[in-house]
């Protein structure tokens, strides 16, 4: 009996520009994803922004940015929603995050598995140390995603620098993904 205010789709290859309108009309006011950040040629310039749909409706959008920090290299495009809770991933996720002028916190989702696993003992052992603060590493804090997103959304609403993206969210990295239901794909595109 709980209505979700967050659409959580971390592992999807692209989104129609009609989605913000559909979400708003469904009572959803926050959207979270991660894979769209993988594009290499036309890199998404934002990780926290308002996504404006085809009818002008906008939705608060947050991209997860967890990745390993590799010393001496700039952040990579690939991010994960299956992070390990360790200093390397916390630093990598924070370094990769692009909207530090709006918000100085990042959400790192961690656990073993492909999008459905839970924390392993090593994650929790790292957390016991990282929550106390380690020099040079962002502080770790566990909380519900909904609470985090609501706080960041409020910051974004108050900040004039919060960017807006208009149109579809496209993942060029997976362009040409095949389907066994080509007719459905064609009709979906036409209906958009």
Name what the model sees in each region.
Residues 1-192:
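Catalytic-domain carbohydrate-binding cleft regions of carbohydrate-active enzymes
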